[in-house]
């Protein structure tokens, strides 16, 4: 979220950043809203100040036995009192209009983010690992899972509809093993603190990380019982990512600089409506309403944020290296960035069944964009004035897509799947998954 004072002082820079995102200029409209807000506040305050002054003048007039003056002032007071509610309402509406407009503005890209329109313009940063070579035509993950009798989309559809899956037996264990492996790696070697957070969150938490108000249509809401729509105060949201709850751990707090960086990780179910994905990845586990993801969140200072971004990317990459999966890293162009991001790296894992790379992790630096919405600050060492923290988030990595990658990269001609060496300690002696 941007400070209107910063926009007023840097209107050309603000508009240039929007244009790089492919968005129209907006500073003039925002400054007009701010002018209206200032005028409404000034008018309301002037009326209140006049009421206060008139009250004192009435006392002085009565003390001087100037009844005519006192009565005139009382009449003026009555008029001011009568218009006061309208002035206060105008002030409230003017403030709300500006706040609403500011809340819907995406973050601006850093200068080194490549310009582009969509994912086709994302430059490749590096390619890592060797793609497996098969003596047979590799299958896609859903054919492998269904062939094993362990991946059941029909049963899931009976329970919940489209874009759900039921994994069973050793395949379910393999998925659980992936999440455990990721948490152990990030907590044991990468310095993250494991968190087991709620997966239901309130409006203010999702506003803080900027899923609300812009991304509401892509989320699932939950009520206690069949609550009527007007009972919005009891509304919860199923988290689309544990970034929401991990980042909000510092909402409305003032940290000491020596506490930073804070690094959190969690492996949770996530829920997305996939509102804009009609017709895409309709079969399989690539794009589901419910999926498991291991999340990485860092809270740090402005000076260390970019270094922390590179570190987070390295931590996410290490998951794929340990699993022996080939991947590439791309930098998202200005037209493909997320709403809250200043800069994003995507890691795309190689899927031989599909014959292409698919996203398995996004690592983003957000600057103070989320911190301003959350009012999350820190006090520099030896300083009196507080500053906004900088926040980062990344997938470390998507567990469901990691399962897809393992199935496709470790498949065998007989339909079985070898378990990656890194996961063997979690599999209870299972080294190969075959049809039972």
UniProtKB/Swiss-Prot annotation:
Residues binding L-serine: 241-243, 295, 395
UniProt key word Hydrolase: no
GO cellular component: cytoplasm
Class in the EC hierarchy, top level: ligase
Catalytic activity: tRNA(Ser) + L-serine + ATP = L-seryl-tRNA(Ser) + AMP + diphosphate + H(+); tRNA(Sec) + L-serine + ATP = L-seryl-tRNA(Sec) + AMP + diphosphate + H(+)
CDD domains: SerRS_core
GO biological process, one term: seryl-tRNA aminoacylation
Binding site for ATP: 272-274, 359-362
SUPFAM superfamilies for this protein: Class II aaRS and biotin synthetases, tRNA-binding arm
Pathway(s) served: Aminoacyl-tRNA biosynthesis; selenocysteinyl-tRNA(Sec) biosynthesis; L-seryl-tRNA(Sec) from L-serine and tRNA(Sec): step 1/1
Key word Ligase present: yes
Subcellular localization, as worded in the UniProt entry: Cytoplasm
Entry's EC annotation: 6.1.1.11
Record keywords, A-Z: Aminoacyl-tRNA synthetase, ATP-binding, Cytoplasm, Ligase, Nucleotide-binding, Protein biosynthesis
InterPro entries in the record: aa-tRNA-synt_IIb, aa-tRNA-synth_II, aa-tRNA-synth_II/BPL/LPL, Ser-tRNA-ligase_type_1, Ser-tRNA-synth_1_N, SerRS_1_N_sf, SerRS_core, tRNA-bd_arm
Function field: Catalyzes the attachment of serine to tRNA(Ser). Is also able to aminoacylate tRNA(Sec) with serine, to form the misacylated tRNA L-seryl-tRNA(Sec), which will be further converted into selenocysteinyl-tRNA(Sec).
Domain-related comment: Consists of two distinct domains, a catalytic core and a N-terminal extension that is involved in tRNA binding.
Assembly, per entry: Homodimer. The tRNA molecule binds across the dimer.
Protein name according to UniProt: Serine--tRNA ligase
Organism, as annotated: Beijerinckia indica subsp. indica (strain ATCC 9039 / DSM 1715 / NCIMB 8712)
Lineage: Bacteria, Pseudomonadati, Pseudomonadota, Alphaproteobacteria, Hyphomicrobiales
